[in-house]
């Protein structure tokens, strides 16, 4: 515990909050261009082929972002919208690609949680 004199000489330092998505530079989303689209495998207890893309953002950063949902239409030079949010079992993947925005198509035949996957409301058959 510091004395009053010690506090007068050197005040307490504020705790600086570190951003979990520094490449977005305090923006909610950023536009970017896909430089590589590929699949990768998750960490130990899980097993899959997760779809990811390396994206060069308008902020100048190059990040790895996750393509969520079943199936996608992304390839090299696709323009995408990137948001924050990490994937726990993929090391180094701290961003998501927004489905249904710019060149990214929404998930086809999706009926539940459609807004997260950029899918329009299906036509009701009478």
Swiss-Prot record:
Annotated positions of the 3-methylthioaspartic acid modification: 89
Keywords attached to this entry: Methylation, Ribonucleoprotein, Ribosomal protein, RNA-binding, rRNA-binding, tRNA-binding
One Pfam family cited in the UniProt record for this chain: Ribosom_S12_S23
Keyword Transport part of the UniProt annotation: no
Cysteines engaged in disulfide bonds, as pairs: none
InterPro entries referenced in this protein's UniProt entry, alphabetically: NA-bd_OB-fold, Ribosomal_uS12, Ribosomal_uS12_bac
Subunit structure comment from the entry: Part of the 30S ribosomal subunit. Contacts proteins S8 and S17. May interact with IF1 in the 30S initiation complex.
Protein family (similarity comment): Belongs to the universal ribosomal protein uS12 family.
GO terms under biological process: translation
Gene Ontology CC: small ribosomal subunit
Coiled coil: none
Family annotation (Gene3D superfamilies): Nucleic acid-binding proteins
Function: With S4 and S5 plays an important role in translational accuracy.
HAMAP family: Ribosomal_uS12_B
One term of GO molecular function: structural constituent of ribosome
Protein name, as recorded: Small ribosomal subunit protein uS12
Organism of provenance: Sulfurimonas denitrificans (strain ATCC 33889 / DSM 1251)
